[in-house]
């Protein structure tokens, strides 16, 4: 029978000093036999997805205490990728994932916490906490801050839903007036919560449901809706129950590595492919699997991408569908339900809230449940009032979207496409693979051949795209030395993809990079090219004007030069000595913190995880 970890610091005569300190935090005599639950919050006023979390940690803490536990809250850092985008601030985004994971480990292990509730929301916070949960393998429940309501603008054609990507595209479009840009800017992000489309934050919060580590509704219930409070209340009670089951009943099935097994990772990736989730989820699932010693790899993602259809399309893949619409159609449990009926997921797996995923679907899939309370839950609607306050409205739709032929969520027979929403491509410039969000690629350019336009920084590419005539239809914008080591930090290329759209080139050009893309990116945007240029990848050998061939249906990407020519170029590169595999003219200040990250990080094909074996003494 496992012992409560907290007893290391709460029991025994020699722990009198530690108990004295615990007492100074408010603990009483009767508390020292209770499970100590870490409430891992991520409140910050920098990030709209986190501005409303300040009081939610204490909400969970009070519920933990009601259930018989002792709650102790702390915060992690949280970077807003949208605010950090387009400048050197983005160098810090992906590295912050590792810092978040480490900070959770440090706090939980230093204080011997028995279990934890992870209150996350935005892009790197959920992955960082997920990595920590898999690393620590103590009972854990995830509850996110929830998506923001979609912005709305009134046009001559009627009301249109918008988000920050629309504002960015409008701002770079010379045909849009300053006044209209102002309207878009003021309307794009109306409430607290993670950005309203199927961007990275919402994708990851949806995947925690598929992994079995979060309550149903976690990925789709709006941050502003009163229904979301129930998730926080239930999480507080659930985590105490899970802790007791593990420490008092020796039930290891509740642990993260038991719940988030290989099959659960397959479920999560299947969901991601079916809903056209962010390509960043590939990085994060690989990293979380690595922490939990789950043998889930790019090869598994490639295998799944060839058999899973697209059942749901959300902004940025389509213009007018956002997370609030997915929720009305039954949320993530409805998508999982359709995947189950198609024989595409495993349902014999445990979750933190149900004995099996099959049991969870019986209760929460709106197409099979008879529960009126579940139907009411998924009718939660946006309030339409700008606010930074959680649970501030309780509006409901009159009905659910149960149309599986033409609705927001489709059944397998009426899929948007039989080919999945993400694909892994391989070829002579991506021997270890690269990722494309096929759900956001127009059918006319699934096969594309063009001339390489070489840039060794995102900034240089942006300057060229915005300069009239420098980038033409048919070009392949190739941005390199922006990978995990080369950046360092693997910047998101949201501005280049958005500006290509602004210039009317969104369906006429491709963008290929060893960096990554925002969940808000769409178009023929191919990222995570591995090995990256800074690691000696062949993307570093492509020359201006080379022909790049992209064939998504056949999963191929290559530069149309012979192996002999590539070998000659490689020899010439290696002959440069210390200057080899480095950008020629880029001037970028790289801090010691980022240098340390670059020294230890690995390829995007491995999730850009840290590898301490790189250390040389």
UniProtKB/Swiss-Prot annotation:
One of its GO terms (biological process) is isoleucine biosynthetic process. GO terms for cellular component: cytosol. One of its GO terms (molecular function) is dihydroxy-acid dehydratase activity. The keyword Metal-binding applies. SUPFAM superfamilies: IlvD/EDD N-terminal domain-like (SSF143975), LeuD/IlvD-like (SSF52016). It comes from the Bacteria. It catalyses: (2R)-2,3-dihydroxy-3-methylbutanoate = 3-methyl-2-oxobutanoate + H2O; (2R,3R)-2,3-dihydroxy-3-methylpentanoate = (S)-3-methyl-2-oxopentanoate + H2O. Pfam families: ILV_EDD_C (PF24877), ILVD_EDD_N (PF00920). Pathway: Amino-acid biosynthesis; L-isoleucine biosynthesis; L-isoleucine from 2-oxobutanoate: step 3/4; Amino-acid biosynthesis; L-valine biosynthesis; L-valine from pyruvate: step 3/4. Binds 1 [2Fe-2S] cluster per subunit. This cluster acts as a Lewis acid cofactor. Disulfide bonds: none annotated. HAMAP family: IlvD (MF_00012). PANTHER family: D-XYLONATE DEHYDRATASE, D-XYLONATE DEHYDRATASE YAGF-RELATED. Functions in the biosynthesis of branched-chain amino acids. Catalyzes the dehydration of (2R,3R)-2,3-dihydroxy-3-methylpentanoate (2,3-dihydroxy-3-methylvalerate) into 2-oxo-3-methylpentanoate (2-oxo-3-methylvalerate) and of (2R)-2,3-dihydroxy-3-methylbutanoate (2,3-dihydroxyisovalerate) into 2-oxo-3-methylbutanoate (2-oxoisovalerate), the penultimate precursor to L-isoleucine and L-valine, respectively. Belongs to the IlvD/Edd family. This is Dihydroxy-acid dehydratase. The gene is ilvD.
């Amino acid at each position: 029978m496992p012992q409560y970890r907290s007893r290391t610091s709460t029991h025994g005569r020699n722990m009198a000093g530690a108990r004295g300190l615990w007492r100074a935090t408010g603990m009483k005599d009767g508390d020292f036999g209770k499970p100590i639950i870490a409430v891992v919050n991520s409140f910050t006023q920098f990030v709209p997805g986190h501005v409303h979390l300040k009081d939610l940690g204490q909400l969970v803490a009070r519920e933990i205490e009601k259930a018989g536990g002792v709650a102790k809250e702390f915060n992690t850092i949280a970077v807003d990728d949208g605010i950090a985008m387009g400048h050197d601030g983005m160098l810090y985004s992906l590295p912050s994932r590792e810092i978040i994971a480490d900070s959770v480990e440090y706090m939980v292990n230093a204080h011997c916490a028995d279990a934890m509730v992870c209150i996350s929301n935005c892009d790197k916070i959920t992955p960082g906490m997920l990595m920590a949960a898999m690393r620590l393998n103590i009972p854990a429940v995830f509850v996110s801050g929830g998506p923001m309501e979609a912005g709305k603008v009134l046009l001559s054609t009627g009301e249109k839903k918008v988000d920050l990507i629309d504002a960015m595209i409008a701002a770079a479009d010379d045909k849009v007036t300053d006044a209209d840009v102002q309207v878009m800017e003021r309307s794009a992000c109306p409430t607290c919560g993670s950005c309203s489309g199927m961007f990275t934050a919402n994708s990851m919060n949806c995947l925690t449901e598929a992994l079995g580590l979060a309550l149903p509704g976690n990925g789709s219930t709006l941050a502003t809706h009163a229904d979301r409070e129930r998730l926080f209340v239930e999480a507080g009670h659930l985590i105490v129950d899970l802790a007791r089951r593990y420490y008092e009943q020796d039930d290891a099935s509740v642990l993260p590595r038991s719940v988030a097994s290989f099959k659960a990772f397959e479920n999560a990736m299947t969901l991601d492919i079916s809903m056209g989730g962010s390509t960043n989820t590939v990085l994060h699932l690989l990293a979380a699997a690595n922490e939990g010693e789950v043998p889930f790899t790019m090869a598994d993602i490639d295998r799944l991408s060839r058999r899973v259809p697209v059942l749901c399309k959300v902004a940025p893949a389509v213009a007018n569908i956002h997370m609030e619409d997915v929720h009305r159609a039954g949320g993530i449990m409805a998508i999982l339900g359709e995947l189950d009926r198609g024989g595409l997921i495993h349902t014999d797996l445990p979750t933190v809230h149900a004995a099996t995923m099959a049991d969870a679907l019986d209760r929460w899939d709106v197409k099979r449940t008879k529960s009126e309370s579940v139907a009411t839950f998924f009718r939660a609607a946006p309030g339409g009032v700008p606010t930074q306050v959680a649970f501030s409205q309780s509006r409901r739709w009159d009905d659910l979207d149960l149309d599986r032929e033409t609705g927001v969520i489709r059944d397998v027979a009426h899929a948007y496409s039989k080919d999945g929403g993400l694909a892994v491509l391989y070829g002579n410039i991506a021997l270890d693979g690269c990722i494309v969000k096929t759900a956001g690629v127009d059918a006319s350019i699934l096969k594309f051949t063009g001339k390489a336009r070489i840039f060794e920084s995102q900034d240089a590419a942006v300057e060229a795209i915005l300069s009239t005539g420098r980038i033409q239809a048919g070009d392949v914008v190739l941005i390199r030395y922006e990978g995990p080591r080369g950046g360092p930090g693997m910047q998101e290329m949201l501005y280049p993809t958005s500006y290509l759209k602004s210039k009317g080139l969104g369906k006429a050009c491709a963008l290929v990079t060893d960096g990554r893309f925002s969940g808000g990116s769409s178009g023929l945007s191919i990222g995570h090219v591995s090995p990256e240029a800074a690691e000696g990848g062949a993307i570093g050998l492509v020359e201006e004007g080379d022909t790049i061939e992209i064939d998504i249906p056949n999963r191929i990407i290559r530069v149309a030069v012979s192996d002999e020519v590539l070998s000659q170029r490689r020899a010439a590169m290696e002959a440069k000595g210390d200057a080899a595999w480095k950008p020629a003219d880029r001037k970028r200040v790289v801090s010691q913190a980022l240098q340390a990250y670059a020294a230890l990080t690995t390829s995007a094909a491995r999730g850009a995880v840290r590898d301490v074996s790189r250390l040389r003494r």
